[in-house]
Amino acid sequence: MLPALFQCGELERRLNLFDATMIIVGNIIGIGIFTTTGLIAEALPDAVMIIAVWIIGGLLTLCGALTYAELGAAMPRAGGEYVYLKEAYGPLYGFLNGWTYFFVINPGSIAAMAIGLIFYLERFWPGVSLERNLVRISFLGQSPKLSTGQVMAIAIVFFFSAINYCGVRAGSLVQNVLTVAKLGSILAISVLGFMIGSGSWNHFSSTHTLAGPADFLGQLSLAMIAVIFAFTGWFTSTYVASEIKEPQRNVPYSIIYGTLIVMGVYALINMAYLYALPVEQMKGVINVGETAARALFGSSASVYVSLAIIISILGAINSIILTAPRIYFAMARDGLFFQGVAKVHPRFKSPANSIVIQAIWSCILVFSGTFGQLLTCTVVAMLTFSIMTGMANFILRKRKPDLPRPYKTHGYPWIPAAFVASYLLILANAMVSRPKEGLLGLAIVGLGVPIYFFWKRKITARLA
């Protein structure tokens, strides 16, 4: 039990299994599924291998989902990974996770998606553009520009933050609508593509000679990195575990069901892409979703794909804004963040201050334009935290054998071991391929160490 000093109201359990599952599906499916396959085709130019790598990536993600499901059921509290790392390794490691997600990963992701959304909104609203400047501001010898696109991106961040400020039910209702809409649009593109599209099943025939074992493993590794990151977000319901009804059941099942739904959707849409285009025409194509739609339905179809992407990005933005503030809220409850962030809104029962501080920082990143570089540097940190969380399953089984576990990982210890091993390989590849960014990412995490001890001293002083 935490000191009363840090207790400022309680979050309420208002989310059911459907809500929690839609949060996960909405978070995972962003823009990646519309852009990643072209990059995979460049690494593995074979239709069967492309489908196989998506299935393998989905199965590895499912291993992670089953691993996190046990932790989420055993510790259904706000914060997700922050809670599990704190329990397994100590408060410093939990704090470093929360610090990195607050300082870079979550606000940076929100900023990146909000800016990415502008590229698609321009098609329907030409006045909103990152190239159309409203004002140039002189500050410390620099002259940053504020464009209409940045203003719209900031407005989008504040709009969804305001919705979630008004309570988890309001945020989850919007999430449900956006997630169902994005699933519907992806299914429509896929099914109609097979039914009435101008594609060919001959595109699935293998005409490419695979490289030797060493080169093939390198190509497979590059493709797997892209796939794994297209599945990022499969554990986000754990952040709102303290607001989910029957959490011992609904938290693990939301993770598992959400991952399985996305696996099915990803497999289907990739089959539609391959039905539309031969692999040679997909290699290196970033906007593979639009390219496939034009091949299936004609040039005008790209408009509908753009709409699907807009809906998809909006759903992913709302999902992060809904879930991520619970991490900082949990940190503040432990005295490791600003005390005001620990407060629950008396009427809306939301972590209101946590939502506000995330919105402000996200908008600063939108304005500064530095989020892209920061996110690139934190890939290694994200992988490291996931590996540590997977290992926490083993540690807590030994250290806390009496901890109630309403759900236990199926296939233990092989399933968690497969998850940890696969992520270790991906981490090694990331460090080898981008050592500078990897080291910078670890440096960002390391910056949290002195900040942790600063907060720890503040706790000691308050409780003295």
Give residue spans per PLM region:
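Hydrophobic transmembrane alpha-helices that form the core helical bundles
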Residues: 39-42, 54, 62-157, 162-165, ...
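Membrane-interface "cap" regions at the ends of multi-pass membrane proteins
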Residues: 1-38, 42-47, 61-66, 75-78, ...
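TM-loop-TM module centered on a large, flexible mid-protein loop between adjacent transmembrane helices
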Residues: 83-84, 90, 122-132, 208-211, ...
